[in-house]
Design a protein with these regions (language model features):
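Extracellular/virion structural assembly segments
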Residues: 1-199
């Protein structure tokens, strides 16, 4: 792995999140549909970095992107969160591969539909697909997608804030473009990258 995306200096101007899951669909003459998924779901991002001077952002960012050696290396990237959860959130009970409802405890607040979570036992990131608010005992049941790809044990830690995605670049050519100059004549750079989750 080749480090973490330099989020401290390279702020996102735009961030588009996509879900990638190859599905084969066949339709009969009568209109019936047969669908089969042929691999695991993974997330992808298209991110545009704020326009800035090389000394402010782009020197460090260019060096980081070069270290990735195209798509060879993996790195982590953290998108913003939506919910207002606090506490040390843990898995409550044992959950099998394929489960989509997970019991948790130690939580206060609400996980919002669209929030990302990650379990300590593996790198896959999951999306919460329905709001889940902790009850008076700090417990909740969350519904996630995709289904679990690795079983969970009781008291596994759930990461809900600053969830790191392990990703790789999906394009072999990375281009840093200039988009003009500021009022002092400093060249301004812009960069857009496409990444996909590494499972």
């Amino acid at each position: 792995m080749s480090g973490a995306f330099p989020i401290s200096t390279s702020k996102f101007e735009t961030l588009g999140i996509k879900s990638v899951q190859n599905t084969i669909i066949s339709k009969s003459i009568s209109g019936k549909k047969l669908a089969r998924q042929v691999d695991n779901q993974r997330f992808g991002f298209t991110a545009r970095i704020i326009t800035a001077k090389r000394s402010d952002v782009y020197g460090e960012l260019m060096a980081f992107i070069m270290k990735q050696r195209s798509g060879k290396e993996n790195f982590t990237i953290i998108p913003p969160a939506r919910g207002n959860v606090s506490g040390t959130v843990l898995v409550n009970g044992v959950h099998a591969v394929g489960d989509t409802t997970i019991d948790i405890d130690g939580m206060t607040g609400t996980l919002k539909a669209g929030d990302f979570i990650k379990f300590a036992s593996h790198n896959k990131v999951y999306m919460v697909v329905a709001d889940a608010t902790a009850d008076g005992s700090n417990e909740a049941t969350i519904t996630i997608e995709p289904p679990l790809i690795t079983a969970l044990t009781n008291d596994s830690v759930v990461t809900y804030d600053n969830v790191p995605f392990t990703v790789h670049l999906i394009n072999d050519i990375q281009e840093f473009g200039t988009v003009g100059a500021d009022k002092d004549g400093n060249v301004l750079y812009q960069f857009e990258l496409d990444v996909e989750e590494t499972l």
